[in-house]
Amino acid sequence: MKMRKVVSAMLVAAMATGMVAGCGSSSDSKSDKKDAKGKVYYLNFKPEQDEQWQDLAKEYTKETGVDVTVLTAASGEYEKTLKSEMAKSNAPTLFQVNGPVGLASWKDYCYDLKDSDVAKQLTSDDFALMDGDKMSGIAYVIESYGIIYNKELLKKAGYSADDITNFDSFKKVVEDITANKDKLGFSAFTSAGMDGSSDWRFKTHLANLPIYYEYKDEGIDNTDAIKGTYLDNYRQIWDLYINNATCKPTELSTKTADDATADFVTGDAVFYQNGTWEYNNIKDVGDDNLGILPIYIGVEGEEDQGICTGTENYWCVNSKASEDDIQATLDFMNWCVTSDDGVKAMCKDMGFTIPFKKNLKSDNVLVNEANKYTEDGKAPVSWNFSTMPSEEWKNGVGSALTSYAADP
């Protein structure tokens, strides 16, 4: 227990020190194949949508004659891959940054999008990533994350979502499931894997909650002045995850995203922290059985909290590319968000809510459940992790979380 207290202090230091230190129409985009000029090279951030982007690229090439190459970075490796690819002669023409912090590294490579056709399709200027008067990026998806749950298993345990309104009530349900897991045949949580395919869920997405609440309290919007007010809350939700899961806390360093997905899909766990993007991987559970809860961490007034909703996905066009390639890339982007095929692929096949005029009602039950919280007057939690100082900072938090879990 003494070592656990030491590692707990390391976790506080990793967060607090890092924070202070860091601190048109579809026809517009169509062209005759014989007149096709330029090419598109898209470095995709989302491994879970790789297949859909590959299919969409082929469809666009078939329709226009413009070559579209899609390379998908491995989970957690996007920045490293982007640096490597940008150093090549055939660099990506379309890439993405996660917000202001990510933009700082790539702003000299960003073409000004403010006069582009795709910018005119945005439903709000809030979805543009600005660098002064320059529109350096455009959000292409709005997503939500929280605690996905299996309604049937929760009912079997004797509860419903109505019984969970804050951290204390959630803790009661979770620990009761753990106390009866042998009889029930399932655990409360999926594994909180801390390998590279899964650790972002906790070192980034879960860490957003204490940052969000301190930003809200202090009226700040960056980590320079943060004090770490809610780090104890961060620790207690992490304790709940790792002590009531399908595996021992000491095993988390080798557990993967696929392990957690399998835990959930096979009915071995009720709760699974993830987001709307995970729908295609878990839809076999059945739409009637899928729900999503806010991530409660024990903050006063959290009964009025909704789901974490926002974006860290901003398209940027490489200003160093040739004029033909830049135009081809702009045309491809516009086609994706205006054409029937493009919009269907993004909204239906990828399950996205897109911040463009032709967004379709989602078939993704997690999107609709998340939206219902807002419709019911619950306050969505903004995504503030794009203001985290660096990937190195996040990795420091991840290492502290892993060490903390490994201490018996």
What do the PLM-derived regions correspond to, one by one?
Residues 112-126, 189, 193-196, 211-236, ...:
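Short, solvent-exposed loop/beta-turn-alpha elements that line the ligand-binding surface or hinge
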Residues 4-11, 21-102, 118-120, 253, ...:
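Conserved N-terminal structural module of periplasmic/extracytoplasmic solute-binding proteins
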Residues 85, 92-93, 119-154, 187, ...:
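A structural signal for short loop-to-beta-strand junctions that line the ligand-binding cleft
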Residues 98-149, 201, 205, 291-294:
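Hinge/lid segment of periplasmic solute-binding proteins
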Residues 174-175, 220-253:
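Glycine-centered hinge/linker elements that transmit conformational signals in sensory
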